[in-house]
Amino acid sequence: MDYNYHTHTDRCGHALGEDEQYVKAAIEAGFKVLGFSDHVPFKEVHHPSERMDYAQMEGYLESINSLKAKYADKIEIKVGFELEYFPEFKDYYQELLNRCDYLICGQHNKTLDAYSYDLYADDEDVIIYANQVKAAMESALVSFIAHPDYFMLGRNHWSD
């Protein structure tokens, strides 16, 4: 694989290491493109184990853009965000897209208050999940879908 567009930083609470360490490791591994995609921060809510605090967003963008310039002759670096698609935030997502290279949809939660599909997902939840992912694709804001089978973490079997 020559590229990775789904890289988180320690700001999200579930990754380790400094931003530049990821770049150096990607170069060493022969990557041509490294895309950072930390989880979208929200002013309204902060979940330290899921996403950066809203106040960290500027530092994230500055850090990755600085690395993009520093390593331009060695690797293509992109900066983006991973979002859960909630239509009420469509304008906010567009503002973010105007400031970065791409957005991806990783629909972890049914609602912003962190009802997570990895804990439990019954048949009704799977339909809601599918509709949320479909709406994200139809919005034309996201470039691709991350872990489209995420809802299966909360299920032991496929249903009919």
What is the role of each PLM region?
Residues 75-119:
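Hydrophobic alpha-helical segments and helix pairs
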Residues 26-35, 95-102, 135-141:
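Short, functional N-terminal and low-complexity linear motifs
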Residues 11-13, 100, 104-160:
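Domain-core and long-helix interface of multi-subunit machines
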Residues 19, 88-89, 129:
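Amphipathic coiled-coil/heptad-repeat helices and related helical stalk/stem segments
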Residues 1-83, 92, 151-156:
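An N-terminally biased module of ancient metal coordination in phosphate/nucleic-acid-related enzymes
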Residues 23, 56-69, 76, 95, ...:
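Histidine/acidic residue-rich metal-binding segments in metalloenzymes
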